[in-house]
From Swiss-Prot:
Organism (species): Rickettsia prowazekii (strain Madrid E)
Signal peptide coordinates: none
Pfam family, one: TRCF
UniProt cross-references to CDD domains, sorted A to Z: DEXHc_TRCF (cd17991), SF2_C_TRCF (cd18810)
This protein's name: Transcription-repair-coupling factor
Chain's role: Couples transcription and DNA repair by recognizing RNA polymerase (RNAP) stalled at DNA lesions. Mediates ATP-dependent release of RNAP and its truncated transcript from the DNA, and recruitment of nucleotide excision repair machinery to the damaged site.
Main location: cytoplasm
The Helicase C-terminal domain, residue ranges: 777-933
Compartment(s) where it occurs, according to its Swiss-Prot or TrEMBL record: Cytoplasm
């Protein structure tokens, strides 16, 4: 065994140097934690131009887990194993040391199952579909997640690790093209010369592996377990949650990760050896815990393999590592001679002269290749600006071999600490700018978030503008003049049916509730209700506009920023701002400096950086140059959140000379009185408070900015007090799930809206399960969290439920400790319990919903919610947001009583929360909340009843129209009619093109929202890109939509065609006399004027020319 020493920060550089000098040799670099493995992999891609560098990730589940790992991780592991076995050249593999213990499929397995595709190769869609299913890919209606594929027309879309989307276009029996596409937008981005597809899982379900599973299952567990759902799923060729824990049963033998390389040299340190031993202890503990849990329930369908069946022993792996050719590394910070010569760390200590020190070092080392390594784009840009100010030349690089001498090279490289060698000097921006955690790129933009809301399901209540509330039954095709046409079938009172052509789908709106009374077709009751509500909406709209106008009339002195101090404050931010954060900050800056009062809502998920955005706003105002003693008030709903914000503000604003105080129930009456006096005199710059701040005795000296955090938690009287402040104060509201009233005002443009939808780097979605209470699953969940070193929340809706929960926990997990917190305890006692939970003095916090705001504990990542059906949608969402806030996956279990019948309303809430798992879905939740409860009375606070008359979507539309009317904005005004067009053509989306009914309805709804010809053409391009060439029936539909847009312009209410020409009927209130007379004069031999605003145009027509003919007719009418 060879031993080497060098600075820890140079580990990857050292490994790459070895790898580069021995290109035919395989290497494994094993490290002690997953984060380091991924970072070293990214560094290696920079340091080396060799493509044979691979990363093998660890599962994000625990040993003997009943849940499956993240699909991206599973696919990435399989992809890496495939590349290792199919690539004969020298390779470098980077991984967590514990992965060396994994038993993996035999090493020859992946060489049989990978696919290499390229344009012009002979391959049919059916052949590829069958092979993908056999390779553990899941066929779906649309491909969104890793390991999924979708068949659409002549196209197969597939999602591979990254995640990256690929679109394979077929022509008969060969592949025509392969393109990469954006998973969010589904739009192609570039062509690919070839595509290698590895199995999507380490377990491939085919006749051979299923046969092995049957035999090995019988050998290990003695019986077939034909009533076992896991067993039944596997022998049927279906995946089952957690079946990865039985991997050895699927193969005749297993290999280790080392076996996948050719006599590799293993590079490791003592921490790696320790990680191997710790993992062995961990999986042995989990085995004992799982065995104990299995005894609690008869016929548990997760049989438990022994540790030696699932893993290699630590002693065997350690012995392998210590063989003579392997390298044990240790670290020193002083200069060391090594294979790469003189490596040493650089330390920047004098922070006040950091950049002067930097350029002294650069001057002394200008004979070397100097590389400044930035972690993210924002710091990269900052460093670039600084270099320019010092008048140095710089060179932007992506790989080390692009570096030049006699210039400063800069690149985005994840390096932690500076170091130098004989040839290179590496300097990190993290030391220069004191950066810490990074953020990833934008995950979902506003457009995508809003598109998620646009769904319509069979059986849902809908509203027709003219006929009222009905129930959408299904899409149904009928023949009209011998041609198929898609219609929406709507059920009305008395079993009456209404069929709406899909090109007029915009007249159908979602009702937004599970409870509704069907209207009767032909009844005048609907129009009376609609007219009555329209008058009330007019009153509301007028009032809202007056409020908004009053605020705009209150001219505010533009805030003059202290730019030098503000730049310093921004530079102290320990993260890199996300794109959405920067957009929100710029929005606020514009609001504060434009001379009008700000009224803005920031909607962003928990942990997505709303607080920092608010702090920027606070700084802009509190340090403004043109205000005398400006004050900022931050209002929060709970004492816990108040304390948390106060601590963060004190730390963040340190050194800027601002006096910050908090006012809540933990503050004594005497101290509170002093704070109020200081507020009134202007001595306090920033006050953070709960409802204690909303007191009639609270007076401000010069309140310029009011920030309302978690605004959905404030009650009527509290908001009345806030209203009294708002008419002369800038207002910024923040929420993950805004109350429907605030959301409505934002969506109608009366309140400005900024959305932060960018998750932190490596944030994983919280896995959410809705289930009857099951003690075995609860025990498993709590022990899983305990054994991975974390803590758990157990939430009770009511204090009286806590006694039962305590009894259950004593029986289920007697080995774990717990404490209780609820609102009837004194604030000091709650603080004491919370402080102990923060530092990990006990395992489980049993609490009421008081934790839904203000709790941020990275180690607490499991939550059980008792009687979840009794909680509101936004409450459930906020509670779930307490977990999974770091880089560890969170697990939420929403339990319901097994013997209780759940109402359809409650069930809908639970379905929404379970399905809204994507990061940044708070806006979606708020909109669903509006669907369920209604936007309510926008002037007062009642959130029920009024919207019931017409439903959410139509109410929203009527309000927008009324506001537009009052503001003389004609853009969104309601059309007085909807053109009906009958050209005798087949009009529908064929099942062969889009087979999924829900997706098809979503596309129809999008078509209903197209408002001009350019939008139609863009939509058409998107469809061709996603699904292939348009079938004639779909093309007819889009052509008719364009014709319909022309009909709006010409006030044509009906357009019918026959063999001998067209019949046009104009809208009764439209004055088209001049146009008609001019047209008749020009085409006197072909036209006739009929009663009831009808115009007949005579011309022999054939199907293939009818679209062209009608377009010529309408454009002629338009241009006359």
């Amino acid at each position: 065994m060879i031993q080497q020493k060098f600075p820890a920060t140079a580990k990857c550089f050292y490994v790459i140097d070895n790898f580069t000098k021995n290109l035919n040799q395989d290497f494994i670099l094993s490290v002690s934690n997953e984060e380091e493995a991924l970072q070293l992999y990214k560094q290696a891609l920079f340091f080396s131009s060799n493509d044979n560098i691979y990363y093998f990730p660890s599962y994000d589940t625990i040993p003997y887990d009943h849940t499956s790992p993240n699909a991206n991780i599973v696919s990435r592991r399989a992809e890496t194993l495939t590349k290792l076995i199919t690539n004969s050249k020298g390779k470098l593999l980077i991984t967590h040391a514990a992965n060396l213990l994994n038993k993996l499929p035999p090493k020859d397995f992946f060489s049989k199952y990978f696919l290499k595709l390229y344009p012009k190769i002979k391959f049919t869609m059916d052949e590829l579909s069958m092979l993908l299913v056999e390779n553990s890919f899941t066929r779906n209606t649309s491909s969104i997640d890793v390991g999924e594929f979708a068949v659409r027309g002549e196209i197969i879309d597939i999602i591979l690790p990254g995640p990256k989307g690929y679109r394979i276009n077929f022509s008969w029996d060969y592949i025509e093209s392969i393109k990469e596409f954006d998973i969010n937008t589904q739009i192609s981005t570039k062509y690919c010369a070839e595509l290698v597809i590895s199995p999507a899982n380490e377990i491939v379900l085919n006749s051979e592996t299923i046969g092995n599973f049957k035999n090995n299952y019988l050998r290990n567990f003695g019986v077939n377990h034909t009533d076992n759902p896991l067993y039944e799923a596997v022998i049927s060729g279906r995946k089952f949650a957690g079946y990865e824990q039985l991997l050895p049963l699927f193969y005749y033998s297993c290999s280790s990760l080392v076996d996948y390389l050719n006599n590799p040299i293993c590079i490791f340190d003592n921490l790696s050896k320790q990680a191997i031993l710790e993992f062995e202890n961990s999986y042995n503990d989990f085995y004992l815990a799982r065995s104990k849990a299995n005894k609690l329930k008869v016929n548990n369908f997760y049989p438990t393999l022994s540790p030696t069946s699932l893993y290699f022993t630590a002693s065997a792996i350690t012995e392998l590592l210590e063989q003579k050719n392997n390298i044990l590394i240790s670290y020193e910070n002083s200069e060391q001679a090594s294979l790469i010569g003189n490596i040493s760390s650089i330390s920047f200590i004098e922070k006040k002269t950091i950049f002067d020190k930097l350029f002294e070092i650069i001057k002394a080392n200008f004979h070397k290749k100097i590389i400044i390594c930035s972690s993210v784009l924002s710091s990269f840009e900052r460093i670039k600006s600084i270099i320019q100010n010092y008048e140095y030349t710089f060179n932007e690089i992506n790989k080390l071999d692009e570096a030049k001498a006699s210039v400063i090279n800069i690149g985005i490289i994840p390096l932690n600490q500076s170091f130098y060698t004989k040839e290179y000097l590496f300097i990190t921006s993290s030391e220069l700018l004191e950066e810490k955690t990074l953020y990833t790129n934008t995950n979902k933009k506003l457009k995508n978030i809003l598109l998620e809301l646009d769904n319509l399901k069979e059986g849902e209540f809908v509203v027709h503008k003219d006929h009222g509330i009905g129930q959408f039954l299904k899409l149904e095709a009928f023949k009209i003049q011998g041609k198929l046409h898609d219609f929406l079938k709507i059920l009305y009172f008395g079993n009456d049916k209404l069929y709406v052509p899909v090109e007029n789908i915009e007249v159908i709106k979602k009702y937004g509730s599970d409870n509704a009374e069907l209207n009767k077709l032909g009844s005048v009751a609907w129009n009376k209700s609609k007219a009555k509500l329209k008058n009330r909406i007019k009153e509301i709209s007028l009032h809202l506009i007056q409020i908004a106008a009053k605020r705009k009339l209150n001219i505010s002195t533009p805030i003059e920023l202290d730019l030098e101090a503000y730049d310093k404050f921004c530079a102290n931010f320990p993260f890199s701002e996300t794109e959405d954060q920067l957009t929100a900050i710029n929005d606020i800056r514009e609001d504060l400096t434009n001379g009008m009062l700000m009224d803005r809502l920031i909607c962003g998920d928990v942990g997505f950086g709303k607080t920092e955005v608010a702090m920027r706003a606070v700084f802009m105002v509190a340090k403004s140059l043109n205000e005398y003693l400006p004050q900022v008030a931050v209002v929060v709903p709970t004492t816990i959140l108040c304390s948390q914000h106060f601590s963060r503000f004190i730390e963040r604003f340190k050194g800027f000379g601002l006096n910050i105080k908090q006012l809540s129930s933990v503050i004594s009456s005497k101290e509170a009185n002093i704070i109020r006096l200081e507020l009134a005199s202007g001595k306090i710059n920033i006050i953070i408070g709960t409802h204690a701040l909303l007191h009639k005795n609270t007076k401000f000296f010069n309140l310029k900015l009011l920030i309302i955090d978690e605004e959905q938690h404030f009650g009527v009287s509290q908001k009345e007090f806030l209203k009294s402040l708002k008419s002369s104060t800038h207002v910024l509201a923040m929420s993950a799930t805004p109350i429907p009233r605030t959301l409505q005002m934002s969506m109608t443009g009366l309140k400005e809206l900024s959305i932060i939808a960018t998750p932190p780097l490596n944030r994983l979605e919280v896995r959410t399960s809705v289930m009857p209470f099951d003690p075995v699953i609860i025990r498993d969940a709590l022990l899983r969290e305990h054994f991975r070193g974390g803590r758990s929340f157990y939430v009770a809706p009511r204090i009286k439920d806590m006694e039962d929960i305590e009894k259950q926990l004593k029986q289920i997990v007697p080995e774990l400790s717990y404490k209780i917190a609820h609102g009837k305890m004194t604030p000091s006692k709650i603080d004491e319990v919370m402080s102990e939970f923060y530092v990990g003095k006990f395992d489980i916090l049993i609490s009421t919903t008081i934790i839904e705001s203000g709790i941020d504990i990275a180690e607490a990542n499991t939550m059980i919610i008792h009687k979840a059906d009794t909680l509101g949608l936004s409450q459930l969402y906020q509670l779930r947001g307490r977990i999974g806030r770091g880089k560890i996956r969170g697990y939420a279990y929403l339990t319901v009583a097994s013997n209780k019948k759940i109402t359809s309303h409650s069930l809908r809430r639970l379905e929404i929360i379970q399905n809204s798992c994507s990061l940044g879905s708070g806006f979606t939740i708020a909109s669903h909340d509006a669907d369920l409860r209604g936007f309510g009375n926008l002037i007062g606070e009642e959130q029920s009843g009024q919207i019931k008359e017409v439903g959410t979507e139509l109410y929203q539309e009527m309000l927008e129209e009324q506001i537009a009317l009052l503001k003389d904005d004609p853009i969104v005004l309601e059309q007085a009619f909807i053109p009906n067009i009958n050209l005798g053509l087949s009009v529908f989306i064929p099942d062969s093109y889009v087979s999924d009914s829900a997706l098809k309805i979503g596309l129809y709804r999008r078509i209903g929202n197209l408002s001009n010809e350019m939008e139609v053409e863009k939509f058409k391009d998107e469809m061709i890109d996603r699904f292939g060439l348009l079938p004639i029936e779909f093309n007819n539909l889009l052509d008719i939509v364009k014709i319909k847009l022309l009909c709006f312009k010409l006030n044509i209410e009906n357009l019918d065609s026959g063999d001998d020409g067209f019949v046009i009927r104009f809208y009764k209130n439209a004055d088209m006399t001049d146009k008609i007379l001019k047209f008749v004069s020009r085409y006197s031999n072909q036209t006739k004027i009929k009663p009831n605003n009808k115009l007949v145009f005579i011309k022999k027509l054939v199907d293939k020319n009818i679209i062209t003919e009608v377009n010529q007719l309408l454009w002629t009418l338009l241009e006359i």
